From Swiss-Prot:
It catalyses: GTP + H2O = GDP + phosphate + H(+). The lineage of its organism: Eukaryota, Metazoa, Chordata, Craniata, Vertebrata. It is found in: Cytoplasm; Nucleus. One of its GO terms (cellular component) is nucleus. Its EC number is 3.6.5.-. CDD domains: aeEF2_snRNP_like_IV, eEF2_snRNP_like_C, EF2, EF2_snRNP_III, EF2_snRNP_like_II. It comes from Danio rerio (Zebrafish). SMART domains: EFG_C (SM00838), EFG_IV (SM00889). This is Elongation factor 2b.
Amino acid sequence: MVNFTVDQIRAIMDKKSNIRNMSVIAHVDHGKSTLTDSLVSKAGIIASARAGETRFTDTRKDEQERCITIKSTAISMYYELTENDLAFIKQCKDGSGFLINLIDSPGHVDFSSEVTAALRVTDGALVVVDCVSGVCVQTETVLRQAIAERIKPVLMMNKMDRALLELQLEPEELYQTFQRIVENVNVIISTYGEDEGGPMGNIMIDPVIGTVGFGSGLHGWAFTLKQFAEMYVAKFASKGEAQLSPADRCKKVEDMMKKLWGDRYFDPAGGKFTKTANGPDGKKYPRTFAQLILDPIFKVFDAIMNFKKEETAKLIEKLDIKLDTEDKDKEGKPLLKAVMRRWLPAGEALLQMITIHLPSPVTAQKYRCELLYEGPGDDEAAMGIKNCDPKGPLMMYISKMVPTTDKGRFYAFGRVFSGVVSTGLKVRIMGPNYTPGKKEDLYLKPIQRTILMMGRYVEPIEDVPCGNIVGLVGVDQFLVKTGTITTFDQAHNMRVMKFSVSPVVRVAVEAKNPADLPKLVEGLKRLAKSDPMVQCIIEESGEHIIAGAGELHLEICLKDLEEDHACIPLKKSDPVVSYRETVSAESDQMCLSKSPNKHNRLYMKARPFPDGLAEDIDKGDVSSRQELKTRARYLADKYEWEVTEARKIWCFGPDGTGPNMLVDVTKGVQYLNEIKDSVVAGFQWATKEGALCEENMRAVRFDIHDVTLHTDAIHRGGGQIIPTARRVLYACQLTAEPRLMEPIYLVEIQCPEQVVGGIYGVLNRKRGHVFEESQVMGTPMFVVKAYLPVNESFGFTADLRSNTGGQAFPQCVFDHWQILPGDPKDAASKPCQIVADTRKRKGLKEGIPALDNFLDKL
């Protein structure tokens, strides 16, 4: 079944209960791409001999060179289960052939937006953890995202070869290591997931059920408890039991699996399982997992790595491993690889785990629909998604754009949730800003071609039914990054993805040769398409700004821009950080502004948010879409707001969703509602560009205390009210002790203990502070967690490596905003310097504008 044709894949696509859409997620360098190779080779796409070295899914040249995954890549594989294995599947199934759509995603935190895009189109995730270093910060971030999207995880403990060969652990220690990782992962799942009564049921991972795999991607071997349970069931079976039916056999194997993990012990003399650790004569029994599973593996490793020829031959015969003739002459590591691959093939174990335990689209879309679809839960589109109905209206989500070999064109990459997408079908293409009933951000166009994504290749295909992952040609001109494609007139959008990091680092770019400007603009447009996270902004001064998640992310983006998208030489500025403006006290006076015609007056004050509220708005716990009373209740209970005020929040800003509020605390003002729209517009404008240096505001609450208006409607139109509202908001900000906020990274550094001192030195120089330091159990490694201002993080990795002899590995991820100490109005302070630089860069007037510009006297 090596080169299966498109027609064969197409035939399985209709069996939607036999499709598995899954992504591989993990911390950077825990071996995702290497592990994916075992799966790909099992499905017969690359030669099994090279699996583990090819990294088939790293398609770009820079990915191969740097040995990191940068873009997520999709690949479709076919896998057939035997009769016996089919019995283990608890959901509905249709035949024994399975189509597995696998997406290999990057582990590096700067590319976590790629992971988000991958998660949206899949239903299950294979979480890979390096069993030596355990659960790291990125594992947690990504797993948290997966659970928020209601994606079912299964776990793979990778790099067991390191645990055996480098650390030389005892079987019992290794068991404890595994047990600890399983517990850590389950803690994360239970913290962020819904409880067992939720729509997904119990999603905790448990080796006993078979949702945990162990193995080594590099050597190409892996197993779950199921594989060993099957061996032992066959071994202990008496002669008459050989003809068991698959269902009975399945039950026996499942019973056996329960005995192979946890506090179960094996009495080798009597050949019995017991639950007590000590026998009657006081001698300790070995744990079943150590004795029956790890011990054989240890024996194989020991015999081969110590070149014990006779023992090796005996073991190979006993384990019934058939080696090729060329493998028989190998010794040492090459022989070890060959033997382990034959005995416990990784592809087999993992593909079984995926098909048995991950949900099919039919199962998953039932509980994912409410999270995916913005519209009502009972319209045609929602019903189509819930039932994964090929006869329903087409509903498809595009999660990212993939550049084609043809410069400047993109494949739209996404998943069909309901209906069928086919070549030449006329569809509605809806961007993220589309609202039902309006015409903006909506195009009616035919799809030119539908294609199948296969890692480095694409295959044309006639049509694709729901539950599958697909690429579209000819849609890229109408969407920027993501969007919904549908044939249903009243369809709402699919929800926009929430990214776990935000673009806080910016670089200004310009063309070296001014004549190339049009190419640069075109290139920036393409760059914005090709990366789910990056933002391209044009400042008023005419500068082109690129914003990304971190240094590495920006470096890759700029390289892409220069080589692929714009194809011109560029000049780049040093990286700059975006700041936020805020206030630190209540306004010291009531601020008044009069409208240009002197007939209307607005009175307002500003004050800071209580701690934690801005973060709640970012997370979406408090939002403009909530029901009034629930929101008021939440604010009253958690932040002790007055309920009357909490009910009269006019809006959030900037962009209607940001972490600032406009609250109406007036009593009985005439015509107030008629100017609401104008004041809100002024508020959105002011919070987007604050008074200090035109950066976004954050965590400011503006209270409208009183309004006097002209009785005549013509004298209080938008032209009178909007600029007035903006001026009074600026006055409020400047009278309430304005401050700047800077973004802070959470840095996790793994290092041996002898270099911890060097790390403290680097962090102190860069205004960082350590808030946690712990030792990884059973290893000489320390984990240091610290907060580091993004502004100081440039060159941090290089600095750290040079001070620790290259032994420390940092991971930076954006964590929170923090107020910069010092008053921006005081000429000697650091914030004042930053404000001056920013204003100069943006081409604004020097110095913070005087209060008199905004404040009027009665």
